[in-house]
């Protein structure tokens, strides 16, 4: 419970910082590489092309001196008036990633400004394999899509007759991937510099 609360506040503060920083002098191809937890966790962040405050987030964590896994997630901001938006938390939501039909887990839903922010998790991957895959694309494009499932195929982690616009007023966003390799290499180098002795 404490870990979940910590993640909630860290992500909340992180997203607020990204939204406020709209006047950054950095070019659009620049990735924001940040250190957390005394350097044990490194974040690689990119703001969205459609909704600026939506963030593509790649996370590396030093585990026993190794930084071999990367966690992929992204956020969507919604101002829809649906009072049940919180109920998608923990559910797998249908999406299109660059025309591939997939699911993204709505890991967290929390109030933000005049609406809600939803953090989606896409899983963890081996860093080199992830880079090889992502370098095939120039853009990381996400569209939250509708899905009609019969009762026969329904699972507890899915939403029956899910309609994207019931939950998201802007159901799509994209992030430019230019410079992603350099950003991940930099993040992994920083991650490997972490020493367990830094935290008593």
Residue ranges and their predicted role:
Residues 1-4:
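Positively charged n-region of N-terminal signal peptides that target proteins for export
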Residues 8-17:
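Bacterial N-terminal signal peptides
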Residues 23-200:
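A generic "folded-domain core" signal
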Residues 19-21:
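N-terminal signal peptide c-region/cleavage motif recognized by signal peptidases
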